[in-house]
A protein has these predicted regions:
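Glycine-rich, Arg-bearing micro-motifs that act as flexible, cationic patches
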Residues: 98, 112-137, 148
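A short acidic, glycine-rich active-site loop
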Residues: 51-70
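Conserved beta-strand positions in the Rossmann-like core of class I SAM-dependent methyltransferases
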Residues: 29, 87, 144
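Residue-level recognition of beta-strand->loop/alpha-helix junctions
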Residues: 32, 90-92, 147
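Small/aliphatic-rich secondary-structure junction motif
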Residues: 1-55, 84
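Structural beta-alpha unit
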Residues: 74-113
């Protein structure tokens, strides 16, 4: 079983296609990570206003989760269309995305991990960090990194 990381981007879609071309008809788990909104922070008396209420935060989390489910369904459909026997896994990000990917790959005992690369410049990679770069450097199993389409 391989782990296909999917975020809904064109690069992730391309990665699924390339992975199937290279790896063939193997079982796959499509992984989509979602981030809940930041925890509710009470208003600061110095500012004097409250930006988000707990109810608004809950509603926002619900909208984000709904979108995450749609993205996952899309990824599973793309993987199955490409020829994989795919199932989906939606995971709330508690740690960094790269750590979540590696933890799930370990849990599933994935043969390999497939990620798309955004193609960050050297400066962007230092400032923003790169998920694919971190996965490659910390993985204990093969990682296929598919670059973004030019």
């Amino acid at each position: 079983m391989i782990l296909l990381c999917y975020d809904g981007s064109e690069t992730a879609t391309h990665a699924i296609t390339v992975a199937h071309e290279l790896l063939g008809d193997v079982p796959a788990t499509v992984l989509h990570l979602w981030d809940p909104p930041a925890n509710y922070v009470p208003p600061d008396p110095a500012i004097g206003l409250q930006l988000w209420s707990p109810a608004q935060m809950a509603e926002l989390a619900s909208v984000i989760l709904e979108r995450a489910n749609r993205v996952l369904e899309e990824g599973v459909a793309l993987a199955n269309k490409a020829g994989f026997a795919a199932q989906g896994r939606l995971e709330r990000t508690i740690v960094t995305p790269w750590r979540a990917i590696l933890d799930i790959a370990d849990e599933l005992d994935a043969q390999s991990i497939v990620v798309g690369a955004r193609g960050l410049s050297a400066v962007e990679a230092v400032v923003l960090g790169g998920v694919s770069n971190a996965v490659v450097h910390h993985a204990k199993r093969p990682v296929l990194v598919v670059p973004k389409l030019s």
